[in-house]
Amino acid sequence: IHTSTLLHDDVVDESDLRRGRSTANAIWGNAASVLVGDFLYSRSFQLMVEIDSMPVMRLLADTTNRIAEGEVLQLLHVHNPDTTEAAYLEVIERKTAVLFAAGTQLGALASGADDATQRKLYDYGLQLGRAFQIADDVLDYSADAGALGKNLGDDLAEGKATLPLIHAMAHADEATRQRLRGIVERGDASAMPEVLAAIEGAGSLDYSLRRAHEYAAAAEAALDGLPDGEALAALRGLARYAVDRGH
């Protein structure tokens, strides 16, 4: 399911680089990428049928539906400088965080854990996914392109107002705000230096990382009451890594 979402994402976003390598659509074209993504979706449901578990099918069917809703929501906000922080958070919950949540709940579900434990693991994954996506959006304005494995400024070129830019527009002076609005409307990647200056001036990267750390802390808090051990330590470490990677 995750791989299929990446194939479709790269087509929608017209991306040509992922994890430092050419995307499938850049090599084989959009049609092949969409069809292979569709195949992986259908294959995942074939595998679920083989498991013969209605709870698993219900969880993943709901999850894939919400991911699709998130992608549509994101499209509605492309080139929209009026995108609010609340709207941004709704998009990342649906397009990213719910897949994390499904993955973490599935482990509990497969092991026969009770409903309370499943809820804890689902909430952990949801908070982890939020933290991960915000940190990823920060990297689009701060990382080394080689280390990041994708082109810096892709979000800006696509007209996506992610949290750093949303915060900068809300806290810039009026003249800067109007210039930033125009950049978002045009999807003007050539204006990256001006955008970076505005983001730095407003402290927007620091603000965004604080928000990511808040969600990472909430993810760890969701684990309270679960048995200590290597698995719990790994989950706590993953929450911290999701935010600290590349920073």
List the model feature ranges, each with a label.
Residues 1-247:
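All-alpha prenyltransferase/terpene-synthase fold signal
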